[in-house]
Amino acid sequence: MLKRLARNNSSPWICSRCLQQSQRQRRFNSTFAATATARDHAPSALYGLSASGKTDDDALRKVFDNASFWESFKRGTSNKKPSGIIGNKYLTHPDGFIDFVTVTIQRCNGVVEKVSRAETIEDFKYMVKDLDKLSDLLCRVIDLADFVRSTHPNRQFQIMAVKAYHTVFQYMNQLNTTPVLYDQLKKASDIPEVFESWTEEERIVARILMEDFARFGIGLDDATRQKLVDLSGEIAEVGSQFVEGMSPETPTLKFESKRLKGLDPNLAKALTKWGETRISTMHHEAQAVLRFVDDAEVRRETYSAVRTAGSSTIARLEKMLKLRAELAQLSGYETFSHMTLENKMAKTPEAVNTFLKALYEDSRPSVLADLHELMELKRGDAHQDNFPNRMNAWDKFYYTQKMLSTMEGAYKQRTADSLSAYFSVGTVLQGISRLFDRLYGVRLVPQETQPGEVWEDGVRRLDVISDTEGHIAVLYCDLFSRPGKTPNPAHFTLRCSREILPAELEEMQHMPHRFSSPIEAATDGMSVSYNASRNSYFQLPTIALICDFSKPSSPRPTLLNIHDVRTLFHEMGHALHSILGRTALQNVSGTRCATDIAELPSVLMEHFAFDPSVLALYARHWDTNAPLPLALLENRLAIDNRNGYSELESQILLAMLDQAYHSNLPLDPAFNSTSVYHNTYTRFASVPEPAGTRWQGFFGHLFGYGATYYSYLFDRAIASRIWKGVFNEGRDGGSLDREKGELYKNEVLRWGGGRDGWVCLAGVLRDGKVGEGGEGAMREVGKWGIDAGK
């Protein structure tokens, strides 16, 4: 049951899109070479902010873009009372984790004891709240410790965070095998008076917890449950070995240097010795060969080597898949996919495959149209006699690059200034804040920190202020590069929303603690808000946004390329879900929702990033304050999205492969993952995959996203529908319409995971056809399609 509490938060929120893009492109943050200091342009009155709001709006840009302003802003910190990391008053020093863990386990033991001895109707009515509190207490340590161990630059803090993480994780696993928690929750659920007293949110959390208890073996005999535990551990170990040990069958290729015509001369020279060029199949030079080398046979050899994983890698993958199939059957499920999808919007693998096939059919004409253009290029290439009337897999990159090079050449001739000059970090965040204010009535306000509150000197704290509710969340922005920092953008929810009732404060009055008040003791000294209508406090969602942008080089700010701007909007979409999804119960707050709807807020935010009305809020030249020339951006986006349908086809094929691998096929003694891979590509790929390749050995997402790889495609289709149907694709001011923003907030965001995703979707689209979910609704979403050319 309590496994769930680490489901979305025990690791940073890094979506599949973020990982794919960071692997394809190491971010390049261009800076506009100029000697002038970034000017402080006064905020325009058109944004409709109050005087204080305008001051906050201006400060938001300056804390990121103006070095002298930031230094002055930080100085206010030194006069304040010391605080622990993110305001947690236990963590003023590394050893504070010891007290934090000790107190947490004491409080958890108290909750377990209370649940275990529940007898009366009133006791059982509080059962869900009590178990949710237990989840929250454990998550407070697990989530924060996991964040500190991966992000904090201080080695001693890292060491103590690792110890805290493992101690509490082990304690949590003990609770997972404690039948009394399951028995008491089931008893409470079976009492009509109790069940009817629960809110819809409580009923959903009860169902989630019951499903998770059952999934992890509670209710089974001891021997079977132990086998489940052992299988789960073995899957985790083999899966990690698979991801960490991925290697090609052929690590290096050798060619005569004269055969590499078309490759960048400097790169070719660096790779060549005594007339022989060595190409590593796991590094960027192999991709360069596929894109630029004229010799089709060299490209063919390179493609086959790049797409063929080693035998040991394939063996580890197949072992993981077989173990997962065994785990599912031992747990009473037909397949691992059935087990995984039970609590997702899709519900069944049949529904997922229905969605994928509908999406495949919708995208097929555009995929073939793009392929036809590449074929025309190949037919016009007088030097190619290699299958002249067929597009081969090793040709696609080469002719796509030729097409893009033509577009790039025309683009550069028209470009008088760098696009990045219009996208400083501060102006982009200022634009996001203005967008949030227009649509949802919330804005980002820079806040001085207390000594010890942030883990690195360059971290900025932004308070999220609602125009009706005041302070509603805290966002820490760790956006700039430093040694040892992960290059992957990530959204961490360090503390979730949860309602703290008067009864809990009463309990804290009778517990010894170091704090000045019961509410501080209940929240480890962190920020809360008071809800007068409910006479209760709410934990403020506390979020960390991690990026790896280049540091500003005074006097100019850090400037972002198009990919970085889109990434920042995407990650702020996750943050928005946490900010507005402030539920009473922690288990369903913010991003703690079904995996196949979790990416919706972030993907939808990408649609806003380059909408003309939204661009008018922020895209201005860092030095001259001139507005962005829209034609310049449109040309750049046309180039960046030119390969969109080819990439979409690739993602559909991988999602289909994921479902096939998590069906009952691995239970067959003759199971061969390579045969399944080639069968999938033979049936559906527009360009045939060469015989003998084994690319599935490089499909690392099979471990972390097993049976759910379709989710990002699913959310792209939904986001596209909402962008068109609710926000009118930005036309007629739709992207800034408060009424439309409130509709989306009230039907989707504010629920977190506390409402059925199909009901959310039907509400925001005002389309009852999809409200019931099921295979028919999945087919309908697939038919909506994805406009991959935008």
Curated annotation (Swiss-Prot):
Broad class of enzyme this protein falls into: hydrolase
Cell compartments where the protein resides: Mitochondrion matrix
GO cellular component: mitochondrial matrix; mitochondrion
GO molecular function, one term: metal ion binding
PANTHER family referenced in this protein's UniProt entry, alphabetically: MITOCHONDRIAL INTERMEDIATE PEPTIDASE (PTHR11804:SF79), PROTEASE M3 THIMET OLIGOPEPTIDASE-RELATED (PTHR11804)
SUPFAM superfamilies xref list: Metalloproteases ('zincins'), catalytic domain
Broad class of where this protein is predominantly found: mitochondrion
Gene assigned in the entry: OCT1
Example of a GO biological process term: peptide metabolic process
EC number: 3.4.24.59
Cofactor: Zn(2+)
Organism of this sequence: Phaeosphaeria nodorum (strain SN15 / ATCC MYA-4574 / FGSC 10173) (Glume blotch fungus)
Protein name: Mitochondrial intermediate peptidase
Transit peptide segment: 1-29
